[in-house]
Protein backbone atom coordinates (compact mmCIF):
# COMPACT_ATOMS: atom_id res chain seq x y z
CA UNK A 1 0.00 0.00 0.00
CA UNK A 2 1.28 3.45 -0.94
CA UNK A 3 1.56 5.91 1.93
CA UNK A 4 2.39 9.49 0.88
CA UNK A 5 5.52 11.00 2.39
CA UNK A 6 5.70 14.50 3.80
CA UNK A 7 7.56 15.58 0.64
CA UNK A 8 4.73 14.09 -1.47
CA UNK A 9 2.28 16.22 0.49
CA UNK A 10 4.35 19.38 0.04
CA UNK A 11 4.58 18.75 -3.71
CA UNK A 12 0.83 18.14 -3.83
CA UNK A 13 0.19 21.41 -2.05
CA UNK A 14 2.27 23.28 -4.63
CA UNK A 15 0.32 21.63 -7.48
CA UNK A 16 -3.11 22.45 -6.13
CA UNK A 17 -2.89 25.70 -4.17
CA UNK A 18 -3.81 27.98 -7.10
CA UNK A 19 -6.87 25.83 -7.85
CA UNK A 20 -8.48 25.29 -4.45
CA UNK A 21 -9.87 27.33 -1.59
CA UNK A 22 -8.31 27.33 1.83
CA UNK A 23 -11.26 25.92 3.74
CA UNK A 24 -12.04 26.41 7.43
CA UNK A 25 -11.81 23.85 10.20
CA UNK A 26 -14.73 24.01 12.62
CA UNK A 27 -15.22 22.55 16.08
CA UNK A 28 -18.22 21.78 18.25
CA UNK A 29 -18.11 21.81 22.04
CA UNK A 30 -21.42 19.95 22.09
CA UNK A 31 -20.15 17.08 19.92
CA UNK A 32 -16.87 17.02 21.85
CA UNK A 33 -18.84 16.50 25.07
CA UNK A 34 -20.93 13.72 23.49
CA UNK A 35 -17.90 11.84 22.18
CA UNK A 36 -15.35 12.56 24.89
CA UNK A 37 -12.92 13.64 22.17
CA UNK A 38 -11.88 16.88 20.51
CA UNK A 39 -13.42 16.80 17.01
CA UNK A 40 -12.39 18.90 14.02
CA UNK A 41 -14.49 19.31 10.88
CA UNK A 42 -12.70 20.31 7.67
CA UNK A 43 -15.24 22.09 5.47
CA UNK A 44 -14.24 20.73 2.08
CA UNK A 45 -17.79 21.30 0.85
CA UNK A 46 -16.65 24.94 0.50
CA UNK A 47 -14.23 24.00 -2.29
CA UNK A 48 -14.55 25.67 -5.70
CA UNK A 49 -16.14 22.54 -7.16
CA UNK A 50 -18.52 22.38 -4.19
CA UNK A 51 -17.45 18.88 -3.18
CA UNK A 52 -14.88 17.29 -0.92
CA UNK A 53 -12.81 15.45 -3.55
CA UNK A 54 -11.38 18.61 -5.12
CA UNK A 55 -7.92 18.30 -3.56
CA UNK A 56 -7.24 14.74 -4.71
CA UNK A 57 -8.59 15.29 -8.22
CA UNK A 58 -6.66 18.56 -8.59
CA UNK A 59 -3.46 16.93 -7.44
CA UNK A 60 -3.93 14.05 -9.87
CA UNK A 61 -4.61 16.39 -12.82
CA UNK A 62 -1.91 18.96 -12.04
CA UNK A 63 0.55 16.19 -11.17
CA UNK A 64 0.35 14.69 -14.66
CA UNK A 65 3.39 15.33 -16.85
CA UNK A 66 2.79 17.42 -19.97
CA UNK A 67 3.28 14.45 -22.31
CA UNK A 68 0.22 12.75 -20.80
CA UNK A 69 -2.22 15.62 -21.29
CA UNK A 70 -3.32 15.32 -24.95
CA UNK A 71 -5.77 12.51 -24.38
CA UNK A 72 -7.11 13.91 -21.14
CA UNK A 73 -8.34 12.10 -18.07
CA UNK A 74 -11.19 9.70 -17.43
CA UNK A 75 -12.91 8.19 -14.44
CA UNK A 76 -16.07 6.50 -13.27
CA UNK A 77 -18.11 8.16 -10.57
CA UNK A 78 -21.66 8.85 -9.50
CA UNK A 79 -20.93 12.36 -8.37
CA UNK A 80 -18.31 14.02 -6.19
CA UNK A 81 -15.19 12.70 -7.92
CA UNK A 82 -16.79 13.34 -11.32
CA UNK A 83 -17.38 17.00 -10.43
CA UNK A 84 -13.91 17.47 -8.98
CA UNK A 85 -12.11 15.81 -11.87
CA UNK A 86 -14.04 17.72 -14.54
CA UNK A 87 -13.38 20.97 -12.65
CA UNK A 88 -9.62 20.27 -12.39
CA UNK A 89 -9.36 19.11 -16.01
CA UNK A 90 -11.15 22.27 -17.13
CA UNK A 91 -8.69 24.38 -15.15
CA UNK A 92 -5.80 22.58 -16.84
CA UNK A 93 -7.46 22.80 -20.25
CA UNK A 94 -7.60 19.07 -20.93
CA UNK A 95 -10.48 16.75 -21.84
CA UNK A 96 -12.31 14.84 -19.12
CA UNK A 97 -14.61 11.88 -19.70
CA UNK A 98 -16.71 10.48 -16.88
CA UNK A 99 -18.63 7.21 -16.89
CA UNK A 100 -21.73 7.75 -14.76
CA UNK A 101 -24.73 5.52 -14.12
CA UNK A 102 -27.84 6.87 -15.80
CA UNK A 103 -29.39 6.97 -12.32
CA UNK A 104 -26.88 9.57 -11.05
CA UNK A 105 -28.55 12.79 -9.87
CA UNK A 106 -29.22 15.21 -12.71
CA UNK A 107 -27.68 18.04 -10.68
CA UNK A 108 -24.37 16.13 -10.59
CA UNK A 109 -24.54 15.46 -14.34
CA UNK A 110 -25.28 19.13 -15.03
CA UNK A 111 -22.34 20.21 -12.87
CA UNK A 112 -19.93 17.82 -14.64
CA UNK A 113 -21.07 19.18 -18.01
CA UNK A 114 -20.87 22.73 -16.68
CA UNK A 115 -17.19 22.19 -15.88
CA UNK A 116 -16.60 20.88 -19.40
CA UNK A 117 -16.69 17.16 -18.67
CA UNK A 118 -18.12 14.66 -21.13
CA UNK A 119 -20.46 12.06 -19.64
CA UNK A 120 -20.86 8.52 -20.94
CA UNK A 121 -23.81 6.89 -19.20
CA UNK A 122 -23.97 3.26 -18.14
CA UNK A 123 -26.28 0.95 -16.24
CA UNK A 124 -26.12 1.28 -12.44
CA UNK A 125 -24.00 -1.81 -11.82
CA UNK A 126 -20.31 -2.43 -11.21
CA UNK A 127 -20.00 -4.68 -14.25
CA UNK A 128 -21.61 -2.09 -16.56
CA UNK A 129 -19.50 0.71 -15.11
CA UNK A 130 -16.27 -1.25 -15.61
CA UNK A 131 -17.18 -2.42 -19.13
CA UNK A 132 -18.23 1.06 -20.23
CA UNK A 133 -15.13 2.59 -18.68
CA UNK A 134 -12.88 0.09 -20.49
CA UNK A 135 -14.52 1.14 -23.78
CA UNK A 136 -13.97 4.83 -23.00
CA UNK A 137 -10.28 4.34 -22.23
CA UNK A 138 -9.79 2.20 -25.36
CA UNK A 139 -11.50 4.90 -27.44
CA UNK A 140 -9.83 7.97 -25.93
CA UNK A 141 -6.53 6.75 -24.47
CA UNK A 142 -7.29 8.98 -21.47
CA UNK A 143 -5.39 8.64 -18.20
CA UNK A 144 -7.46 6.90 -15.52
CA UNK A 145 -7.83 8.92 -12.34
CA UNK A 146 -9.29 6.48 -9.84
CA UNK A 147 -12.11 7.86 -7.69
CA UNK A 148 -10.50 6.75 -4.42
CA UNK A 149 -7.32 4.73 -4.99
CA UNK A 150 -5.05 7.07 -6.96
CA UNK A 151 -1.45 7.26 -5.76
CA UNK A 152 -0.94 10.82 -6.98
CA UNK A 153 -4.32 12.03 -5.80
CA UNK A 154 -3.96 10.65 -2.28
CA UNK A 155 -0.97 12.86 -1.46
CA UNK A 156 -3.20 15.97 -1.43
CA UNK A 157 -3.13 18.44 1.44
Q: Residues of each region from the PLM?
A:
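PLP-dependent amino-acid enzyme catalytic core
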Residues: 1-156
